[in-house]
Amino acid sequence: IDGTTNFLYNLSGYAISIAACIGAEPIAAAVFLPATRELFVAAQGHGAWLGSNPLRVSSCESLDTALIGTGFSYSSARREAQGQRISRLLPQVRDIRRCGAAAADLCFVACGRLDAYFEEGLQPWDLAAGQLIASEAGAQISNFSGEPITPSEVLVSTPGIHSSLVASL
């Protein structure tokens, strides 16, 4: 379960996230959102799907029209740094949302409900399924510096705003 705090408090923002990996690389993924009964799936090289509908990221090309998702750490020191990052980013984007489940947010980028998602301090199991689904839907994925993704820094977005987000984060 991703979004365990939401689950414990009976909030709808949680997901069941499963990935099959070879080494650290996800090759098949499924994310189920119980609140909406939506099932997102992907297989490496075969695309991403919501039910029978193929997924594509949004066509957003400007930060000022971008809806961005993020999450917050349980560490107060890390949350303070995250708050500073968000205060710098807020004037540049349409708005920022926090769902509480990284797997769901990654799927929301994949289907175009969000234009980007960033977070720090995730665990590999938070990331594996949603990362593959977003990638197969055409998302660009990196850390905050534009380098290969790690669970400690995750940036997933439409290709049209990725470099602007790297510069802003």
Where are these regions (language model features)?
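Buried hydrophobic packing segments
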Residues: 16, 20, 130-133
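Glycine/serine-rich anion-binding loops at beta->alpha junctions
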Residues: 1-14
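Conserved G/P- and acidic residue-centered "switch" motifs that form tight phosphate/ATP-binding loops
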Residues: 4, 33, 134
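Glycine/threonine-rich flexible loop motifs
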Residues: 9, 78-79, 120
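Oxyanion/phosphate-interacting regions
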Residues: 84-91, 104-169
